[in-house]
């Protein structure tokens, strides 16, 4: 017994044009045309969804994953270095406030970079090169070394001028930082209109900002590493309070005995017994 195959339904859209489709077959033509239109729309939506997903987190078309209702416009538009649209507190709602916060973040990020470096370098030099810093190698004990005999010993070199007066040290620091900050805020020594955040010139002796593409990349690297440095400095502060040791000594202790020297082990010491 041989089974007969069902007859194939002709593709009316390919057989006839819109104007040539016979009246008796108009219904079949319309059905196939509707299916084709739906398929085309689905394909267009898929392409649109694929292309929009690339801009989901970056650039002016990005949407914030934290704002599920999208009830307010997304103001960080990706035009600033390190802007990825994460502003759950709405700190960028007011442009003037956002401008101020951006300036404060960048200045503190730079201070964090220098501060984190200054917190670990004396300890590294004391351990690796054997420079006799004494207690001044620990960053939170360095200031107290001014009150010791001989004052603050720079690099263990007796021929250098050592800080022995905390008032004079503070005054010199205020003057030096005031001159630099005044230069930056006023746009140069004679109000030359330099960018207060990226003044260049004397602040860029190596010419790192000469190439625009390289400069844009360095801006992002600076703010990202600066944010990490600020968190690192916060961690160093907490370590100093909890352990009474510097960051390098804490790291050495942790590597020697991770089970006993870690954040959880120290946290349990402060729990009620």
Swiss-Prot record:
Chlorophyll b 5 binds at residues 173, 270. InterPro entries: Chloro_AB-bd_pln, Chloroa_b-bind. Chlorophyll a 5 binds at residues 221, 239. One of its GO terms (cellular component) is photosystem I. Residues 45-54 have a biased composition (Low complexity). Photoregulated by reversible phosphorylation of its threonine residues. Chlorophyll a 6 binds at residues 254, 263. Keywords: Chlorophyll, Chloroplast, Chromophore, Magnesium, Membrane, Metal-binding, Phosphoprotein, Photosynthesis, Photosystem I, Photosystem II, Plastid, Thylakoid, Transit peptide, Transmembrane, Transmembrane helix. Chlorophyll b 1 binds at residue 66. Binds at least 14 chlorophylls (8 Chl-a and 6 Chl-b) and carotenoids such as lutein and neoxanthin. Disulfide bonds: none annotated. GO terms for biological process: photosynthesis, light harvesting. Chlorophyll b 3 binds at residue 181. Chlorophyll b 4 binds at residues 173, 184. The chain crosses the membrane at residues 106-126, 136-156, 160-180, 228-248. It comes from the Eukaryota. GO terms for molecular function: chlorophyll binding; metal ion binding. Chlorophyll a 2 binds at residue 108. It is a multi-pass membrane protein. The light-harvesting complex (LHC) functions as a light receptor, it captures and delivers excitation energy to photosystems with which it is closely associated. The LHC complex consists of chlorophyll a-b binding proteins. The N-terminus of the protein extends into the stroma where it is involved with adhesion of granal membranes and post-translational modifications; both are believed to mediate the distribution of excitation energy between photosystems I and II. This is Chlorophyll a-b binding protein of LHCII type I, chloroplastic. It comes from Dunaliella salina.
